[in-house]
Design a protein with these regions (language model features):
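Active-site segment of extracytoplasmic enzymes that catalyze sulfate/phosphate-ester chemistry
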Residues: 21, 31-34, 38-129, 148, ...
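Long, internal low-complexity/basic segments
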Residues: 21-27, 34, 39, 64, ...
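Beta-strand elements within well-structured catalytic alpha/beta cores of enzymes
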Residues: 26-38, 57-58, 82-84, 121, ...
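Short, solvent-exposed turn/loop segments enriched in Gly/Ser/Thr/Pro and often Arg
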Residues: 44-49, 64-87, 94, 99, ...
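Substrate-binding rim/cap in mid-to-C-terminal beta-strand-loop elements of soluble/periplasmic
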Residues: 83, 155-172, 246-253, 274-278, ...
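Formylglycine-dependent
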Residues: 93-123, 135-263
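Histidine-centered active-site microenvironments of extracellular/periplasmic hydrolases
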Residues: 142-152, 213-222, 278-335, 345
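C-terminal, low-complexity/hydrophilic appendages and adjacent surface loops
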Residues: 319-325, 389-433, 439, 468-502
């Protein structure tokens, strides 16, 4: 972590003494969450090709976490973790939730039994609003203290245009506009409704973009940035040969149409962030509002031959870039400008936000959280930080520290992985079961077992016969979570070589 100077630390210690429990004195909170979004796609994380001026400004003025990792590579589990602080083997959502749990007679909310961030904030006097993707079940009605509810009846999108949406309690067959703009406008509407209220507000602005998946990647972008990227080569997307484990998304790999579409959607999200920041400044709310920007999970765009997330490979993958998400906090006058190298995860988000706004007494005690509050970092303080980070995707689990990364898979077994991140940060040389590494391999495996033995709920511990609230991707044929694999429409697209560019 970059150490702030002593004078800066003393100033923030003097003026940033925390927030009162009185409702009016607590800051507003805007939590902006993007969908399938690798940190490497943003200018402030080093991308030279994709235009993200608003997020770059937000990072320059606020606290940017350089090593923020997701504990799972799929939408529903990671969103459940952000809202509860729990690992998938604790909250039970191991994969994306199926359509019948979101709409219809069988719909149910996946986190009903847990205390969630919006529920706690509502209890403490916040007005809570959702604008955007939900993907945690029972989408038609608000949950956990939300009084404003603009969302969609499903989890994904096939185009970011003309998708069905739920607005003002009604299901609308086709959205009236580009989804990124729609969620921005609804978010601004919520801010406008509550800007002069006597209670603080919490806005969960949950974009579908950049998404980086589905057949939309075979169609050129249509948003404001389409023309800008139409002739760009975008070399920040490596043109590596597809990895042998790449199970899906082969028709997008090295496809210049797909690459340009991703870039345009990232810039489209940046536009939305800019409008939110401008709205706060226009109403004089910027110094009383903490804005958090992050992604649900990381995404790879050709690095090491992977295109997508960890559930798009067979076996399931646990590459760092599938976990690495942007994380930026912006609160002028309260959060100092800087960068942190602390390895933080989405398990740390809930306790950090609650402590930052003075509600540390409301951090849930049961189930026991695996995360730790990084609120002291937001205040410019130097803190000791854990170096071990844990990840799970159904039968695949991993543990990493500053130097080593260990990956183990069960049901089906293997292959195992061990990497020396100090000399091999891109995880290209697998040292698993190699001579000379027996001791560190054993130590890392024991750490992994001890962590899940301590925290996993037996009901949801997949390694030990537990179940998933969502249907499994890869389950043994005799397991109740098993589902037949869908046919993969790669071949026709791959044969159309004219849309590819090296």
């Amino acid at each position: 972590m970059k150490k702030p100077c002593l004078i800066l630390a003393l100033l923030f210690a003097l003026f940033s003494t925390g927030f009162s429990a009185g409702t009016k004195e607590k800051p507003n909170i805007i939590f902006i969450l993007t969908d399938n979004h690798g940190a490497w796609t943003l200018g402030c994380y080093g991308n030279p090709d994709i235009q993200t001026p608003n997020l770059d400004r937000m990072a320059d003025e606020g606290m940017q976490f350089m090593k923020s990792l997701s504990t799972n590579p799929v939408c529903s589990p990671t969103r459940a973790t952000y809202l509860t602080g729990l690992m998938p083997s604790q909250h039970g959502v191991h994969s994306f939730v199926p359509q019948h749990t979101m709409m219809g007679d069988e719909a149910y909310y996946m986190l009903e039994e847990f205390e969630t961030l919006p529920e706690i904030l509502h209890d403490e006097g916040y007005v809570c609003g959702l604008s955007g993707k939900w993907h945690l079940g029972a989408n038609m009605k608000p949950h956990d203290g939300f009084s404003y509810w603009a969302t969609m009846p499903r989890g994904g999108t096939s185009s970011l245009y003309n998708d069905p949406v739920i607005l003002d309690g009604k299901l609308i067959d086709k959205s009236p506009k580009y989804m990124t703009d729609l969620w921005t406008e609804r978010g601004i509407d919520f801010i406008e409704q509550n800007k002069d209220g006597d209670k603080p507000f919490f806005l969960f602005l949950s974009y579908n973009g950049p998404y980086c998946l589905s057949r939309l990647l075979l169609r050129p972008a249509k948003n404001r940035w389409a023309g800008y990227y139409a002739d760009k080569h975008l070399p920040s997307f490596p043109r590596d040969t597809a990895h042998p484990w790449q199970y899906s998304n082969l028709d997008y790999h090295n496809n210049i149409v797909s690459i340009r579409r991703v870039a345009a959607e990232v810039s489209g999200v940046d536009d939305g962030v800019g409008e939110i920041l401008a709205t706060l400044e226009r109403h004089g709310l910027d110094e009383n509002t903490v804005v958090v920007f992050t992604g649900d999970q990381g995404w790879m765009g050709g690095q090491n031959g992977f295109f997508g997330m960890g559930d798009h490979t067979k076996p399931m993958a646990a590459h760092d870039m599938m976990m690495h998400v942007p994380l930026i906090y912006h609160h002028p006058g309260s959060i100092p400008s800087g960068k942190s190298d602390a390895v933080v995860t989405n398990c740390d988000f809930l306790p950090s936000v609650l402590e930052y706004v003075g509600l540390e007494s409301r951090i849930p005690e049961k189930p026991k959280l695996t995360g730790k509050s990084y609120a002291p970092i937001l205040r410019g303080e130097e803190v000791e930080w854990p170096i071990d980070m844990y990840y799970e995707m159904e039968s695949c689990r991993s543990v990493r520290n500053e130097r080593w990364k260990y990956v183990e898979r069960r049901s089906p077994e293997g292959p195992g992985e061990l990497y020396d991140l100090e000399i091999d940060p891109m995880e290209r040389v697998n040292l698993f079961n190699q001579k000379g590494y027996e001791k560190i391999q054993k130590e890392m495996a024991e750490k992994l077992y001890a962590f899940f033995d301590k925290y996993a709920d037996p009901e949801y511990d997949i390694w030990n016969g537990g179940r998933s609230k969502a249907r499994r991707h890869h389950a043994p044929a005799d397991h109740p979570d098993y589902r037949e694999p869908k046919p993969r429409p790669w071949k026709a697209a791959v044969e159309k070589g004219k849309i590819y560019e090296k």
